[in-house]
Amino acid sequence: MKWKALFTAAILQAQLPITEAQSFGLLDPKLCYLLDGILFIYGVILTALFLRVKFSRSADAPAYQQGQNQLYNELNLGRREEYDVLDKRRGRDPEMGGKPQRRKNPQEGLYNELQKDKMAEAYSEIGMKGERRRGKGHDGLYQGLSTATKDTYDALHMQALPPR
């Protein structure tokens, strides 16, 4: 039975000419022109919408007033100081984890502030504040350390370097 079906298929194939199926695919020029037209119309519409949003935003800008309840406020660079203080909470020591300082004068900061009039000089230096601490006699080593850092420094003992 197999031989009979195979022989019939071979005869039919020999007698009938082999024709290729026509492909009405993406290579048809009419379809390419149609797709180009759709893409052109899409580009024109998208450009028109973009320009409308861009030019309508400048007219609507005064309508959005800045306030306390606004989620995003624009930067106000008009009142910016050249050397502005970062931490507005005076009396907080960053080396003590933000705890309040126990000083006689809480307005006296830990660090020296830059002075605007001295910045005009090319090689001006920042002077050191006089420290009023009860030390162990060699306070020259501890300049600029807070009490918490000074205690840690005291606990560590300096070891002599081995000779080379």
From Swiss-Prot:
Q: Which residues carry this modification: Phosphoserine?
A: S58
- The transmembrane residues are 31-51
Q: Which residues form the ITAM domain?
A: 61-89, 100-128, 131-159
State the GO CC annotations: alpha-beta T cell receptor complex; cytoplasm; Fc-gamma receptor III complex; gamma-delta T cell receptor complex; Golgi apparatus; plasma membrane; T cell receptor complex
- Which key words tag this protein in UniProt? Adaptive immunity, Cell membrane, Host-virus interaction, Immunity, Membrane, Phosphoprotein, Receptor, Repeat, Signal, Transmembrane, Transmembrane helix
| InterPro entries associated with the record | CD3_zeta/IgE_Fc_rcpt_gamma, Phos_immunorcpt_sig_ITAM, T-cell_CD3_zeta
Instruction: Please give the residue ranges for the topological domain Cytoplasmic.
Output: 52-164
List the residue ranges of the region (Disordered). Answer: 83-111, 128-154
User: Where can this protein be found?
Assistant: Cell membrane
How does the record say this protein sits in the membrane?
Single-pass type I membrane protein
Q: Which GO terms describe its molecular function?
A: identical protein binding; protein heterodimerization activity; protein homodimerization activity; protein tyrosine kinase binding; transmembrane signaling receptor activity
| Tissue localization of expression | CD3Z is expressed in normal lymphoid tissue and in peripheral blood mononuclear cells (PBMCs).
> Outcome of D36 to E/L/V?
Decreases cell surface expression of IgG Fc receptor complex
Signal peptide from the UniProt entry = 1-21
The post-translation modification note in this UniProt entry reads: Phosphorylated on Tyr residues after T-cell receptor triggering by LCK in association with CD4/CD8.
* Biased composition range(s): Basic and acidic residues: 83-96
At what positions is Phosphotyrosine found?
Answer: Y64, Y72, Y83, Y111, Y123, Y142, Y153
UniProt disease annotation: Immunodeficiency 25: An immunological deficiency characterized by T-cells impaired immune response to alloantigens, tetanus toxoid and mitogens.
Similarity-based family = Belongs to the CD3Z/FCER1G family.
Quaternary state and interactors: The TCR-CD3 complex is composed of a CD3D/CD3E and a CD3G/CD3E heterodimers that preferentially associate with TCRalpha and TCRbeta, respectively, to form TCRalpha/CD3E/CD3G and TCRbeta/CD3G/CD3E trimers. In turn, the hexamer interacts with CD3Z homodimer to form the TCR-CD3 complex. Alternatively, TCRalpha and TCRbeta can be replaced by TCRgamma and TCRdelta. Interacts with SLA. Interacts with TRAT1. Interacts with DOCK2. Interacts with SLA2. Interacts with SHB. Interacts with ZAP70. Interacts (tyrosine phosphorylated) with SHC1 (via SH2 domain). Interacts with PTPRC.
Report what the protein is called: T-cell surface glycoprotein CD3 zeta chain
The species this protein belongs to is Homo sapiens (Human)
**Source taxonomy lineage?**
Eukaryota, Metazoa, Chordata, Craniata, Vertebrata
Gene name in the database record: CD247
